């Protein structure tokens, strides 16, 4: 289970209103636990190696003898080596992507890691692979449009937004992610309009999704986007505002059964929250995973 967060709304008003409710005061709890107990033993062996060469040799040994098909092994190893030898770390992700070429959940995790490292070109390759194996998923088209933008391939991004917003993708109606995509396409227009002049960016269509006054004043104080790699995963996200009032959003069968079923049926795993007119100060975001993996 992995969540990708990006700070840049659908539930914004509900979030802010619930923060005003009496009784939802946040009390920070601290727990004592042994960090060493959750560190994989092979990472400890890497750390105890006498040199990076020895650590790499241990990686290859574990890969060959135990973890050849283990995606968590590759991800944890990447996290360890990325600050020591980035090229070697990237090669680990490339190997993982080859092992997981037909595993959407694993490929999303690998793509998130490439994005985290700023290697948008390799992330694009992964997202194009996801498009090939999951052509009916809404998420695939949204992710690909975003990565085109990050790679400054504005013509490709514009063309894909045109297909999405004009409902031109065969057997795919992007409804679950519609508001998120509208926000992201709008943001691209307002920040990269000069790059879109000669493209087929769907400006007129996009405007039909946004109230006139909102379009003229497009923007928001703070936007948080959550992407997760497993549509069936259950978790809770808690927002704590500067006044220590909290709001919980639960992604569980008990609390939001219809939404989870919709996500599974139409293939999307993104949620966004827009926060405006908030008190200044530090926000806290806590995430609790209810799924066992």
Regions found by a protein language model. Give the residues of each.
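Generic helix N-cap/helix-start motif at coil->alpha-helix transitions
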Residues: 33-36, 66-74, 85, 100-107, ...
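Residue at a conserved register position within TPR or TPR-like alpha-solenoid repeats
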Residues: 80-81, 114, 148, 189
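Structural register within alpha-helical repeat arrays
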Residues: 76-80, 109-110, 144, 185
């Amino acid at each position: 289970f992995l969540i990708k967060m990006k700070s840049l709304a659908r539930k914004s008003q509900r979030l802010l209103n619930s923060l005003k409710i009496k009784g939802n005061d946040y009390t920070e709890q601290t727990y004592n636990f042994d960090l060493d107990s959750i560190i994989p033993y092979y990472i400890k062996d890497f750390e105890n190696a006498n040199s990076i060469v020895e650590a790499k040799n241990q990686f290859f040994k574990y890969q060959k003898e135990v973890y050849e098909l283990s995606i968590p092994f590759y991800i944890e190893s990447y996290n360890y080596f990325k600050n020591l030898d980035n090229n070697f770390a990237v090669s680990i992700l490339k190997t993982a992507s080859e092992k997981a070429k037909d595993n959407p959940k694993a490929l999303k995790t690998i793509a998130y890691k490439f994005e985290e490292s700023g290697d948008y070109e390799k992330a694009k390759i992964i997202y194009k692979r996801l498009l090939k194996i999951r052509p009916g998923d809404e998420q695939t088209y949204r992710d690909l449009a975003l990565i085109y933008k990050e790679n400054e391939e504005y013509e490709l991004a514009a063309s894909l937004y045109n297909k999405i917003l004009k409902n031109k993708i065969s057997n795919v109606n992007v409804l679950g992610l519609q508001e998120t995509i509208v926000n992201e396409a709008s943001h691209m227009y307002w920040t990269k309009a000069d790059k879109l002049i000669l493209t087929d960016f769907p400006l007129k269509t996009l405007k039909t999704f946004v109230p006139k006054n909102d379009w003229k004043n497009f923007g928001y104080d703070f936007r948080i986007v959550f992407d997760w790699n497993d549509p069936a995963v259950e978790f809770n996200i808690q927002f704590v505002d500067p006044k220590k009032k909290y709001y919980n959003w639960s992604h569980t069968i008990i609390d939001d059964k219809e939404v989870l079923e919709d996500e599974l049926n139409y293939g999307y795993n993104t949620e966004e929250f827009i926060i405006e007119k908030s008190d200044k100060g530090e926000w806290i975001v806590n995430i609790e995973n209810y799924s066992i993996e």
